[in-house]
Amino acid sequence: MDSPPECMLALSCEPPLSPPSMPSLDHSPQFLPQSPQSTPSSPQTELYAPVSPCPLPEASLQDEEEEDEELSTPPSPTPAVALFPGELELGSPSSESSPPATPLAPFPSFGALEKAISSGQSTTCNDELDLQLFNNESIAVTGGTSSGPGLRFPCHVCGKRFRFQSILSLHARAHSLDRERRASAPYRTTHSKLQQNHESNSMIQNPLSGSFQKSMNEDMVPEEPLQTASSPQFLFEGTTALTPPLTEEAPISTSFSPLGHAQLEDNTPSPAAPAFRCHACKGKFRTASELARHVRILHNPYKCTMCPFSASQEERLAAHLQESHPPEDPPAEAVFPSGAIKAPPETPVPQMSVIPAFRCETCGQRFTQSWFLKGHMRKHKDSLDHKCQVCGRGFKEPWFLKNHMKVHLNKLGLKAGLGNLGPPGADQSKGPASSQVLGALYSNLLLARSMAGGGGSGSRTERSDASAGSSKSSILGYLGLPKDSSNGSCMERLQAVAQVAEMGNGGGRGGDSADGADQAAMWQLVARSLVAAQHNQQQQQQQRSHSLHQHPSSRATVAGEAKNMRAYLGGLGSREELDGSSAPWECPDCGKLFRSLQQVVAHAHVHVQKTQKGQSARGGMSREEDIINRVSGTQATGGAGQRTGENESRQEGKQLPSGVGASGSFHSVISHLSGQNGLRGSSPSSSSPRERVRGTGMKDCPYCGKAFRSSHHLKVHLRVHTGERPYKCPHCDYAGTQSGSLKYHLQRHHREQRNAMATSPNSPSPSLPSLTGSPREGAKKRRLPSMSQQSSFGRVPGEAPSSRHTQSWTIGLSEKKEGSSASAHHREGDLESQYRGLSGMMGALLPSGLEQSWIGEVTLPKVPKVSRRKPQITSRMVSANGFQDKMTSQEGGFEPLDLSRRPLQDEGGVSQSGSGPSSGSKGGNDILNQCVFCPFRTSSVELMAMHLQVNHTSKSRRKRGAPISSNNHSQKLARPDRDPLALWKFLGVEDGVASPEDWVSARAENGVSPENRETEDNLELASGAMGSFRSRKKKPQMSEHVDEEDEEIDEEENDLEANGSFANVPQNQSRRAQSVSSDLPDDDLPKEEEGVLGE
């Protein structure tokens, strides 16, 4: 420990004559007797008195004070404040009344106490606290009063003063906890016992001297023991409780207790007490009281009033009170006075809380406000709290509903309002047709209710009284609309009738020109409900007649009848009562099942209108009415048997809606209702939906309400709701709603199948069975696939095109020419197959000499701009003779590049008929097609076409080649059009070539041989063909033009290497082929080649 050298010097001196006294460890107020050695004339109080009578120099005393100030910070500025009035008088007197204590040597055993205190190692705080922040500038000299302007925040409870407001707030929390504990009865009763127990437990456990323990017991105040508890943060376990001073005015006590000479002699070897160090903030203090006060105020501000325990945090003090001082459980009147103690959160509230009225239907959570529930429902994906009063659809947001209502307003003409929905009056003819429909339907619904209840056993008065409450539910049951779950008015719900009346009617903008077919469909719906109600009423009367003797007073109300009616109607009932298996309505055309009749009527728009002959046969009846009549007639036949039979079990399930009577009564009800309400029925002159949409009217979808400008777009859109897919793929199970989707499917997945089948003469072509026709035509083609395909694409093998050079190759242009005949497609495909065979033979026979004779016959047209869109057909078209094309048409241009390698359809590369040699060699499953004019080979038709365009056209040769002047070029002979087949036969017989198959077998080895062998074979074949040609023509070789030909060959090779056409061909092969072609006589050159060379 750090001890000043002056203390060591003082301990080495002789002890004083007078017995020294020990300074008090706590600064609690106490009465201090004056020492006989102290004189009032002493100028100041010395902190350390010399042990021997040898006086120390004044300079040494000053140096000692300066070093002490450097070792430790000044004492804490917070002096003790008296808790009780009168304690100040009991404490040490002021500096004027009592002289300062005589400076004596410190108690020798005080060093042992310091060693015991400093032996503990604190681990709660490692940072050093700056005690200068709490320095009091006006601190008085030891022994005087300590009050100054630094302590500006006094405590109103105990009177302590603090320099900062934060420290005062921490101090005030301890008072608030004490006040709450004192208010309880267990605190008053057990305070004395706990005080005695803690006094006995807080004794010094370490052995100290008897006189020191005695002096501490004398100094303790019995009224209010204020002791610093041993806390985990400040390790004072097993040491004397240090209580800081509680009075602000009282100075720091420096009293000493008398000691005996024996105790002094025993403790003389102990060194002097150094400065006291705080284990939490590493601060040093001169006395233990200052250290205890420092710990009490800064580190442990929360002190327990029932024991010496103190804590640095309020939560630890509260936990200590719950563990060490739990309150007893006396009666509630004594322990818990009114308003003093708050009820814990676990205790139930005395008054019963009202259950929130707004409950979430999805999760069951309840809310007190409606907007809370609305905000909560947004969490659920299926929350559709904004309901449409017309059609019953739900939306998540209000603006969605607002936009949806525009559909009904435009369709029903409700912008001006429809307030008069009663029976039709005198001025009803002036209004729009939708208003007439609404009024007529409303009146007929009331009539239906009267007819349904006409045979009932109840009186007319009772039925009229009960009709007011059940009108809305019965009307909804007739119309097949959902029940009203949002308390909407019946006027709003009746507007939904117009959705049935205006199906496919462009919003009623046509005025009096309403479609009779749509009105007939609406009346069929209402009449079917009426007949079903009558049938249900008759069955109920029969049941009542059997049970009348048992229950004579039992009567069924109108509401009960309406409920039974809705359950009986099934498909026309509410949507909530429908299940997925109930589908009683069947479309007579396609056989699809629907839940209600209005869905069948909406589905009728999908099918194309029948021909005029069929309409005249039916007497001009519209298709919708015919569908309804067929459905009604089909289901009425089953209903007649039900009405006469006694089996009641057949009235359930899908057959329940079919019990509507015969077709005669069905149409009689329609005519009766239509004539009574002044609405005209369907007439032969009524316009069809297609003719109606020709104007400016809009077509609305009856399912979702979307508007379309034409019936075609509506027809395509309705397929989404009805599931109609008329365009089916002939190769797989795919079916599309539009022709474009089937085109894309065939182009993407079935190109090779379509191409292979389109070019085969014996098999019908499946390409585009229903692309140019209507859905009805597509259905006919599906029913008779063989007949339609043979008539459209079938071609007899004996057919030959009239003009081979004038036909166009329409590969890639089929989307632009959907209306062209299918036979032209096949003839064009056959043309290109013939050209492939002939071009292969000419390429094998005449490598370069007679190339322009072939091009002269089939002139290359100007290539139009080819679209970058992927064409419909991009693969090779293999004809009957097994040859492939390398040329473009006059209209279609070149086919887009397709570098994919596809397997050959006919293995071997040559068909069975085998009219000529193949244009390439088979390598694996791919055919390497060789160019007619050069040794270039490729398996892609597109790449070969591009090669021909870049390298073997007059324009490309004009750019590459230099003009060749020759004396023999002056005489030009106009050659007539040669037939390549005749030329082949003529040369083949003279040269010893047996057949084209032998020639193919001789060249088939080129595609799989090594490069050197391939080059040699090509050279031998070319030289052999050239030698035979020379022997036949007997023309000498032109040797004087060898230099010019070499220059042309070099220039052409450089150009071709730049274009990348000869990437896979050796240079010597290209040079030899060009040299062979240059040795041909001038007579054999065509007109076009002669013109190019003449330039």
From Swiss-Prot:
Region (Disordered): 1-107, 320-343, 453-472, 532-560, 630-698, 743-810, 866-924, 951-976, 1003-1095
Compositional bias (Low complexity): 23-44, 85-99, 534-554, 908-920
Disrupted-gene phenotype: Morpholino knockdown of the protein results in a curved body axis. Expression of col2a1a and sncgb in the developing notochord at 24 hours post-fertilization is significantly reduced.
Principal location class: nucleus
Keyword Hydrolase annotated: no
UniProt biased composition (Polar residues): 665-680, 872-891, 1061-1076
Tissue expression from the record: Highly expressed in heart and brain. Also detected at lower levels in muscle and testis.
Single GO term (MF): DNA-binding transcription activator activity, RNA polymerase II-specific
GO BP term, example: regulation of DNA-templated transcription
Gene Ontology CC terms, in alphabetical order: nucleus
Domain comment (free text): C2H2-type zinc-finger domains 6 and 9 are important for binding to the GGGGG motif in target DNA, and for the interaction with sox9a.
Quaternary context: Interacts with sox9a.
Protein name: Zinc finger protein 219
Upper taxonomic lineage: Eukaryota, Metazoa, Chordata, Craniata, Vertebrata
